[in-house]
């Protein structure tokens, strides 16, 4: 049996608003550790991974791993019936064919209950390899949203370039060209110092030998989180022999019909966390919204992406004040938002043949 209670329904509403344009049907994988969703869009150009930790719920119980196949548009409609500050409880029995949602009002004795039909969705277990990136940009999510929305008015693609100068977003359109440069500030380094320490890029640090002025450079590689997915930016979009997914290039994927079914996230098993206090529903508690821009890089990176997808990703700014862009040449872009109850990550294959 599954029972998950959230302090506010607003969290689920914002999550669904962030991903419903990318994924139509998906499995929510529930286990003792929490609730996860992982699926690719129909063109196999983008992948979305959502993690809701068990400790982020006011109450959480999951007796055994179970997938909940839902149509995201239908779930969005059911969630619209709840007020943002309603206490939301999700229930499902073993082998159930319905998902029960209970909304409890904080200001009155009103209790609303909805039963939503579940779907049988074919899913595969994904192999998720560790990935290292050459550059990481940490910035206010509101700034990222503004940039991609502004540039989408002029063109269909954006070139994101990370260099010693800063991070540049450039787009070319029929009527006009645009370029936005964000430089790193010292204030940002301090404010983002502890943000995403487990997600560091590979870099170099100088180690001075004792008794000598000679410096030896050594490469520092920090293991990525298990959710980071390594995808080939050239061709593919299907499982390889080891069960790992590779994204198709943005150019190729946009030409396909939207008839692919999304895939679920790999299940994990961990100790139950029932009864632990829930984290409040709010934006990122790790960094302020006006933190400026922090850039960590090992080498120059320049890639081109579809603005249509980035605009969709930016809807997650409602969940977090801060966004991280992780990049390496010829590797899909990772856009990560962290919030009190977990995180949401997007992977987008770069366009091929564009400067």
Regions found by a protein language model. Give the residues of each.
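DNA polymerase sliding clamps and clamp-related checkpoint/processivity subunits
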Residues: 1-20, 25-152, 159-355
């Amino acid at each position: 049996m599954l029972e998950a209670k959230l302090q506010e329904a607003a969290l689920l509403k914002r999550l669904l608003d962030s991903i419903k344009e990318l994924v139509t049907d998906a499995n929510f994988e529930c286990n003792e550790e929490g609730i996860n969703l992982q699926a690719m869009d129909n063109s196999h150009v983008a992948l979305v991974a959502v993690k809701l930790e068990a400790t982020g719920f006011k109450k959480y119980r999951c007796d055994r791993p179970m997938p909940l196949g839902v149509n995201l548009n239908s779930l969005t409609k059911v969630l619209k019936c709840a007020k943002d500050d309603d206490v939301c409880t999700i229930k499902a029995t073993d082998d159930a064919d319905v998902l029960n949602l209970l909304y409890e009002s904080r200001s009155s004795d009103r209790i609303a209950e909805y039963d939503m039909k579940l779907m049988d969705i074919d899913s595969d277990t994904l192999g998720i390899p560790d990935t290292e990136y050459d550059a990481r940009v940490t910035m206010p999510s509101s700034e990222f949203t503004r940039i991609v929305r502004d540039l989408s008015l002029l063109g269909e693609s954006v070139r994101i370039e990370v260099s010693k100068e800063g991070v540049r977003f450039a787009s070319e359109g029929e009527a006009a060209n645009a370029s936005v440069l964000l430089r790193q500030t010292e204030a940002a380094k301090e404010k983002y110092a502890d943000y995403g320490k487990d997600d560091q890029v590979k870099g170099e640090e100088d180690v001075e030998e004792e008794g000598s002025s000679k410096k030896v450079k050594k490469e520092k590689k920090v293991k990525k989180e298990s959710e980071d997915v390594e995808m080939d930016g050239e061709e593919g979009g299907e499982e390889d022999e080891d069960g790992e997914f590779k994204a198709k290039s943005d150019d190729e994927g946009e030409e396909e019909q939207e008839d692919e079914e999304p895939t679920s996230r790999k299940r994990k098993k961990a100790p139950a966390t029932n009864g632990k206090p829930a984290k409040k529903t709010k934006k990122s508690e790790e960094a302020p919204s006006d933190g400026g821009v922090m850039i960590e890089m090992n080498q120059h990176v320049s890639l081109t992406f579809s603005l249509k997808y980035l605009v969709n990703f930016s809807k997650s700014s409602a969940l977090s004040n801060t966004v991280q862009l992780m990049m390496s040449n010829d590797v899909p872009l990772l856009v990560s938002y962290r919030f009190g109850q977990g995180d949401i990550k997007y992977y987008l294959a770069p366009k091929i043949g564009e400067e």
